[in-house]
Regions:
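Pair of pore-lining "gating" transmembrane helices in MFS-fold secondary transporters
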Residues: 7-38, 104-111
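Membrane-helix boundary and inter-helical linker elements of multi-pass secondary transporters
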Residues: 41, 71-72, 126, 156-162
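Intracellular juxtamembrane helix-capping segments at the cytosolic ends
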Residues: 34-35, 113-129
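Helix-loop-helix hairpin linking two adjacent transmembrane segments in secondary transporters
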Residues: 150-179
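Glycine-rich segments within core transmembrane alpha-helices of 12-TM secondary carriers
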Residues: 49-61, 132-155, 159
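C-terminal ends and interior cores of transmembrane alpha-helices
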Residues: 83-100
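Short extramembrane helix-to-coil loop segments that connect adjacent transmembrane helices in Major
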Residues: 40-47
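Cytoplasmic membrane-interface "Motif A"-like loop-to-helix N-cap segments
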Residues: 71-83, 161-170
């Protein structure tokens, strides 16, 4: 890996983090697709500014609670518990996607996205020191770029085969892989 400049002892953690970020970004893209499609079929687009403001307010509370609950905790433990919570909650929302659960999904997908990416970069920062990060973080970010391409191209065939109502299960799958 001389082109990428990764030392032999860094290969395994770099590869794992690459695929972890690939999975997180894939979950984000598939989840956002479901969130947007379901919301915009049931609610007028004029409600989007309200959703954006609500997300900001909710995230302020979530971040404060997150900091309190995770202080001093092992990052891998936090990611594992969060991944389980995210997967279970999305599964429950999937089975109740009507009425007020649609805006809840819209907001919750943003919470899942922000916390997952936040947790990933904290973990990457714990694994690699600043010197290593300068060399390796570009590769990790590429995992997200590949996910953008893969998920972007893969959503249409997935929906054609399994139906749009099952796209949230793909999101749950990617969250599970990322843990």
């Amino acid at each position: 890996m001389a082109i990428i400049n990764i030392k032999s002892k860094e290969r395994k953690p770099a590869a794992l983090l690459f695929f972890m970020f690939f999975s997180i970004v894939s979950a984000t893209i598939t989840g956002a697709s479901v969130r947007d499609a379901v919301f915009l079929t049931q609610f007028d687009k004029s409600y989007l500014p309200v959703m954006f403001i609500t997300i900001a307010v909710v995230m302020a509370g979530v971040i404060a609670l997150y900091k309190k609950l995770t202080a001093g905790q092992d990052q891998i433990f936090v990611i594992s518990i969060s991944g389980a919570l995210f997967s279970i909650s999305l599964f429950l929302l999937q089975s109740n996607l009507s009425g007020l659960f649609i805006p809840v999904l819209y907001i919750w997908m943003e919470v899942v996205t922000i916390l997952s990416i936040f947790q990933f970069w904290i973990l990457a920062g714990e694994i690699f020191n600043a010197r290593q990060a300068k060399r390796i973080f570009t590769l990790l970010g590429a995992g997200g770029s590949f996910a953008g391409m893969g998920a972007g191209f893969g959503i249409k065939p997935f929906v054609s085969t399994f139906g749009s109502e099952n796209l949230l299960f793909l999101t749950i799958f990617f969250i599970g892989i990322s843990v």
